[in-house]
A protein has these predicted regions:
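Membrane-proximal, glycine/serine-rich, low-complexity loop/turn segments characteristic
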Residues: 2-260, 280-319, 353, 360-382, ...
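Outer membrane beta-barrel strand-and-loop segments of large Gram-negative receptors
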Residues: 218, 358, 400-404, 412, ...
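Signature of Gram-negative outer-membrane beta-barrel scaffolds
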Residues: 373-466, 475-476, 645
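Outer membrane beta-barrel transmembrane domains
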Residues: 391, 395-396, 497, 503-508, ...
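Conserved C-terminal beta-signal and adjacent last beta-strands/turns
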Residues: 615-634, 648-757
């Protein structure tokens, strides 16, 4: 089998063509697949620019789509092939009608030699900086789809902030059992407890025509969360023409958070505007459950069918927060002649409930051998209640409290056409959503209610063509969106004195649309895409600045002119089964519109920002039988301009990395990954512009079948890691930094056992 093949709308990747170190997990394998990119920090994954939503194993869902559990716990040696495709729901598979929306998945196919083998590993580790870890991982997969997995982990190996009590504990189980060709039961359960904390600083600049504004803040925060969730479902073919699917899930979580912060705002010339000292803590408790079901009856061999659908969900949550703050306004004079100071000792209790249900019917009718039509109707209802009670120094405050109750009743009428030929596939449809929404809201002593009827539209089009190793696809997706009911009510929320918000009953519905063209040829190793999106009547916040206090007042408004486009081109080449070359380049442009008022006029001014970015990536890999080398270079440039303020900013960043490993005699393995990062641009200081992060590892596998492993991992060997996050726009810039523990090591012992069942 070749490294990459296209079969219809499915891309098949030969996992055996990409070598990984002995004992590596799935994440290590995917790093070596051209076109696959995984951002570990934000847990997102893409393949040739397409977002991957979940990981499946042998066609079945794995932990309800929790990709992180698969990436960090599935052994790479299990996988023979990786399929990438747009996964359809069970109802869409039965009716053979695609109803829009994308759900790209990685479907892992396990090797035959591991079919029916229980693969278990257990390990323990300890290191400096109070590092520790324990784990137990057990997987059993059968190629027909049956599987069971148990994962238990505890420790703080990858926690790098300075908080001493960092820890995460996970226990999870997933199973799929096919009792027959007609009946399948599947489910999962997960428990997660984590404690984390951060010491961070934030610097921001805001560019105003009346003079720039600068803000510095420092904070210490802790977070503790305990969560449990699970799901259970079944697929049942009552006979050859009747299909029933039902699934449900539940979750329960508790959290406890604290934060201590100091913040100071000044203008040009270092003239102080305000300063805030705040201590806060909050607790939350929530639980929810939902159930979905559908039943389909096929009437003839052509595929004429009728489907009934239903769903119900219920959730409740309670939030409690306490905040003690002192705000000093240096530009306002108090009655005693000094600076004005606002003290607040505020407690909030905020319970909320959300309940929704829906019922629907779909009629599917084949019009020709490859052409199907589907008519659908669905009725849904939703009720939400939230009640925020605010107390100031233990005295109830009407003006800072808020009660909201909303109801939504909607109808969905849908029409879809699907054509599925040998080379062409066309899926098109439109949804119409008439709805009635009502809102009762009380803020302080003011009461307001509103009722709004509207119609939303959602047209969709997907056209694809493929021949041999070439595939093109065109997508269009449009949707109208009504403004949030709370934004339509003319009430004021001043619970935060520096960020006061208002409503606007004149808001209009927004309409967003997205066009995307993709192309790929596996023989040439080329792929690319072009995207364009824009929004009519986009909702944004008109911002009024109070130059004396440094605060803002906002209210929602509609604006036009928001649009963006981007394009990317990728190249992949593999030769002699050892060398791999991949390259990527791209560019994007975005225009965003806002309304701002800096106190110079009654009406806000139109502020237009242009963001332009370019990127390029080059990667070269060499994989001999005894190891691997991966050299990568990355360049990114971003430039932003604002027409109202005539300001301009840019950020340029470079990253070079080298990942290597070598398998040595007697079961030894050494590995190293090093990355050098450098950046320059607007207001980037010397000493904060570069870093070298070098991680080292070594392991020894011993005993008769190499079941035991002793390993050493040394993170950030040079203790040079800097955790910076920077965002630059034409209206200003923000940069945050989180303190790191620096270099640390951990020594681990692991034992593996494979048993054929």
């Amino acid at each position: 089998m070749k490294e990459v093949e296209i079969k219809g709308d499915t891309t098949v990747i030969n996992a055996n063509a990409f070598y990984t170190p002995e004992g590596a997990y799935l994440e290590e394998l995917l790093k070596r697949v051209p076109g696959l990119e995984y951002e570990k920090q934000n847990k997102t994954m893409t393949y040739n620019g397409l977002p991957i939503h979940e990981i499946n194993v042998n066609g079945e869902s794995f932990f309800g789509g929790n990709s992180t559990l698969a990436l960090e716990n599935l052994p790479a040696k299990l996988v023979s092939k990786i399929k990438v495709y747009d996964k359809r729901s069970e109802l869409e598979k039965i009716t053979k009608v695609r109803k829009g929306g994308e759900n790209y998945v990685l479907d892992l196919q396990t090797k035959r030699e591991f079919n029916g083998t229980l693969i278990t590993s257990a390990g323990i580790g300890i290191g400096n900086n109070d590092k520790k870890e324990t784990e137990l991982i057990s997987n059993l997969f059968r190629q027909k789809g049956d599987n069971i997995s148990v994962i238990a982990r505890s420790g703080n190996r990858y926690k790098t902030s300075r908080y001493p009590d960092n820890r995460q504990d996970n226990v999870a189980m997933n199973f799929v059992k096919k009792f027959s060709k007609r009946f399948t039961l599947y489910g999962n359960m997960m428990y997660n407890h984590y404690a984390s904390g951060n010491e961070s600083t934030l610097y921001s600049e805001q560019y105003l025509t009346t003079g720039n504004r600068y803000q510095n803040s420092a904070s210490t925060s802790t977070n503790r969360n305990t969560m449990g969730n699970g799901s259970l479902g079944m697929r049942w073919s009552l006979d050859d023409k009747t299909y029933f699917n039902i699934g449900g899930n539940f979750s329960k979580s508790k959290s406890d958070n604290t934060s201590d912060s100091q913040q100071s705002t000044s203008s040009e010339g270092d003239e102080r505007i305000n300063s805030i000292t705040r201590n806060s803590d909050s607790k939350s408790d929530s639980h929810s459950f939902s159930v979905n079901a559908d039943i389909t009856r096929v009437f003839n061999d052509k595929g004429t069918s009728i489907s009934l659908t239903g769903s119900y969900s219920d959730s409740k949550s309670t939030n409690e927060s306490h905040s003690l703050s002192e705000t000093t306004y240096y530009q306002l004079e108090s009655s005693l002649g000094g600076d004005s100071v606002l003290y607040r000792n505020q407690y909030q209790h905020s319970p909320s409930t959300n309940r929704a249900y829906s019922v629907g019917i779909n009629l599917t009718q084949p019009l020709a051998e490859n052409l199907r039509l589907q008519l659908g109707y669905r009725y849904s209802a939703n009720r939400q209640v939230s009640d925020r009670s605010t107390y100031e120094s233990e005295v109830y405050q009407d003006s800072l409290s808020n009660y909201t109750q909303s109801r939504t009743y909607s109808h969905e009428l849908s029409l879809y056409f699907n054509y599925n030929g040998k080379r062409w596939q066309v899926n098109t449809g439109v949804q119409m959503h008439p709805e009635r929404r009502s809102l009762d809201q009380k803020t302080g002593l003011l009461y307001a209610d509103t009722v709004r009827t509207s119609v939303n539209w959602n047209p969709q089009l997907n056209v694809s063509w493929h021949q041999g190793k070439t595939r093109f696809e065109l997508n269009y997706d449009g949707s109208s969106r009504q403004p949030d009911l709370g934004s339509l009510v003319s009430l004021t929320d001043n619970s935060d004195p520096l960020h006061v918000t208002h409503g606007n009953p004149s808001l209009k519905a927004a309409y967003s649309q997205n066009f995307r063209l993709m192309g790929r040829n596996t023989r040439l190793g080329l792929s690319g895409d072009v995207n364009f999106s824009n929004t009519y009547n986009s909702q944004t916040q008109a911002v009024f600045y109070n130059l004396a206090t440094g605060g803002t007042e906002t209210y929602p408004v509609n604006v036009n002119g928001n649009w963006n486009m981007r394009a990317s081109l990728r190249y992949q080449k593999r030769w002699k089964k050892r060398f791999n070359l991949s390259a990527r380049t791209g560019a994007s442009f975005a225009q965003s519109v806002a309304l701002v008022n800096e106190g110079k006029s009654e009406e806000p001014d139109r502020s237009v920002t242009h963001n332009t970015s370019y990127n390029a990536n080059l990667r070269l890999g060499y994989q001999p039988k005894w190891g691997g080398f991966d050299l990568q270079g990355d360049w990114r440039y971003r430039h932003a301009t604002n027409q109202l303020r005539s300001t301009s900013n840019y950020t340029r960043s470079y990253n070079f990395s080298l990942n290597t490993y070598a398998e040595l005699p007697l079961g030894f393995l050494v590995k190293s990954d090093a990355a050098y990062s450098f950046r320059n641009g607007t207001n980037i200081k010397k000493g904060e512009d570069d870093q070298v992060v070098w991680n080292l590892g070594a392991s020894w596998r011993f005993l008769k079948k190499k079941q035991a492993e002793l390993s050493l991992y040394w993170s950030d060997f040079l203790s040079d890691k800097k955790n910076y996050y920077r965002n630059v726009t034409a209206t200003g810039l923000t940069e945050s930094r989180t303190s790191q523990i620096g270099s640390y090591f951990i020594i681990s012992f692991k034992y593996r056992l494979n048993k054929q069942l």
